[in-house]
From Swiss-Prot:
Protein name: Homeobox protein abdominal-A homolog
Signal sequence bounds: none
Subcellular localization(s) per the UniProt record: Nucleus
This protein's encoding gene: ABD-A
SUPFAM superfamilies in UniProt: Homeodomain-like
InterPro entries noted in UniProt: Antp_homeobox, HD, HD_metazoa, Homeobox_CS, Homeodomain-like_sf
């Protein structure tokens, strides 16, 4: 817990270039992961399942924003 009794927030995760490349590669093939695949990727990249899950959630939101921006241009 922090100084005022509130739980401390985790620091921002930074991914290596290799991890990012592998995650992007996986996202290119599949925007959603099965639990089994998430476990495999987590082990391969030395990350937690939770980090993989959140990375994919964030990446889907990024894609959604990008698609919305392209739609507005056209």
């Amino acid at each position: 817990p922090g100084p005022n009794g509130c739980p401390r927030r985790r620091g921002r995760q930074t991914y290596t270039r290799f991890q990012t490349l592998e995650l992007e590669k996986e996202f290119h093939y599949n925007h959603y992961l099965t639990r089994r695949r998430r476990i495999e990727i987590a082990h391969a990249l030395c990350l937690t399942e939770r980090q993989i899950k959140i990375w994919f959630q964030n990446r889907r939101m990024k894609l959604k924003k990008e698609l919305r921006a392209v739609k507005e241009i056209n």
